[in-house]
């Protein structure tokens, strides 16, 4: 089985980060747990670097622009994110789940993954991790989390 940064991130998110913040262990304990779970130290370190970059790039808390410019995707972004993924990001932004800065952070973190292409499910996990890390995004995170685990996602009203 090919491990990826996303595999490590999903394992961390499902087993540690979704718990109470006080229960999150130090990096050495997390790394030991990941090694015991079968992940390679190389992928673990890449995942920690990904998380460090996410934490360092928190957008400032500001009012979201209602009618901002349309995002034009560049070649590498078009290669990694198919039409469905790009449409999903537009949907989230138009419905106030993501603002433009958060969308850019999601794109940055998606592009930092070691995968040639992301499917919609992978992108949804990236969005969820970004929202989890954003102060003031609790409602958007809760909505996104609900959508992740529903058979038929609810439309926004």
Swiss-Prot record:
InterPro entries: Smg. Disulfide bonds: none annotated. Belongs to the Smg family. NCBIfam families: PRK03430.1. This is Protein Smg homolog. It comes from Stenotrophomonas maltophilia (strain K279a). The gene is smg.
């Amino acid at each position: 089985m090919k491990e990826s940064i996303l595999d490590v991130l999903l394992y961390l998110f499902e087993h540690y980060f979704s718990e109470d913040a006080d229960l999150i262990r130090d990096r050495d304990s997390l790394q030991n747990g990941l090694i015991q779970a079968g992940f390679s130290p190389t992928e673990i370190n890449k995942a920690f670097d990904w998380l460090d970059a996410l934490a360092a790039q928190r957008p400032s808390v500001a009012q979201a622009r209602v009618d901002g410019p349309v995002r034009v995707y560049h070649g590498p972004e078009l290669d990694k994110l198919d039409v469905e993924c790009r449409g999903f990001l537009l949907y989230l932004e138009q419905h106030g789940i993501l603002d433009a800065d958060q969308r850019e952070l999601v794109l940055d973190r998606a592009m930092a993954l070691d995968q040639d292409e992301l499917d919609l499910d992978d992108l949804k996990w990236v969005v969820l991790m970004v929202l989890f890390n954003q102060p003031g995004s609790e409602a958007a995170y809760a909505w996104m989390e609900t959508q992740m685990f529903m058979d038929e996602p609810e439309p926004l009203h």
